[in-house]
């Protein structure tokens, strides 16, 4: 299960939990709005959504939010390894999750968050630098992961095109940020964006749907299909659109 952009809307989590129970859950950033300590309480709820829950930060998050998530039991990934509740990073950048190799890159703006008025977007020059940095980071990873989490869909798209230029490369990239459900494929590189689990914020509950995705993997780890799911946060009623990926591109 893949979700992102909760934006402190804890009211949507019970509906998502009906689908995620006893499955690995990948949460691709933006647990908060401002990254404040008060919002960090959402992290404790999110950490128990999956078995396990794997997470990276988004541009609305902060160190205190991500450390709270780690302290509640989630696998919080950074470019250098796994984040601990005390803020230290340890271990390999590539971890094993349910038989799959997974890596994640934190959002650069998360380090500046935690107070009102922090920046929420990169300049064009910063975005170009970030895509170059993430591409170089991926190229240096060993072993090569099956799945990469990166919050900003623009960075994810650049990484998809970069990796697809390699002969025989296969990778699933999980992303978010744009609040739009989509699946994009270049060769054997698949990018999945589940939309926004936050459903437009607390005040839109009952009017906006929670979006997330279910990735159906074949025994060799390749995604056979992706279900893009839209659920009512109150009733749990849902609809899904299936994207088949088991054909040769």
Model-derived features with residue positions:
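Core catalytic region of metal-dependent phosphoesterases/phosphodiesterases
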Residues: 3, 8-94
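Acidic/histidine-rich helix-loop elements
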Residues: 4-8, 32-33, 111-125, 201-207
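Solvent-exposed loop/turn segments at secondary-structure junctions
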Residues: 6-8, 31-34, 59-63, 82-85, ...
């Amino acid at each position: 299960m893949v979700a992102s952009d909760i934006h402190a809307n804890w009211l949507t989590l019970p509906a998502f939990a009906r689908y995620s129970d006893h499955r690995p859950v990948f949460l691709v950033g933006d647990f908060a709005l401002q990254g404040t300590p008060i919002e960090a309480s959402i992290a404790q709820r999110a950490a128990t959504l999956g078995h396990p829950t794997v997470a990276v930060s988004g541009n609305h998050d902060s160190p205190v939010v991500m450390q709270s998530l780690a302290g509640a039991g989630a696998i919080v990934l950074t470019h250098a390894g796994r984040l601990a509740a005390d803020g230290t990073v340890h271990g390999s950048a590539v971890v094993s999750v349910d038989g799959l190799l997974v890596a994640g890159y934190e959002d650069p703006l998360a380090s500046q968050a935690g107070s009102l008025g922090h920046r929420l977007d990169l300049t064009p020059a910063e975005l170009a630098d970030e895509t170059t940095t993430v591409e170089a980071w991926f190229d240096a990873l060993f072993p090569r992961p099956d799945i990469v989490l990166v919050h900003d869909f623009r960075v994810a798209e650049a990484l998809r095109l970069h990796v697809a230029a390699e002969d025989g490369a296969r990778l699933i990239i999980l992303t978010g940020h744009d609040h739009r459900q989509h699946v994009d494929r270049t060769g054997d590189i698949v990018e999945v964006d589940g939309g926004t689990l936050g459903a437009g914020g607390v005040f839109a509950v009952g009017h906006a749907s929670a979006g997330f995705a279910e990735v159906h993997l074949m025994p060799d780890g390749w995604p056979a299909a992706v279900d893009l799911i839209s659920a009512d946060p109150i009733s749990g009623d849902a609809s899904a659109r299936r994207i088949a990926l088991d054909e040769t591109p």
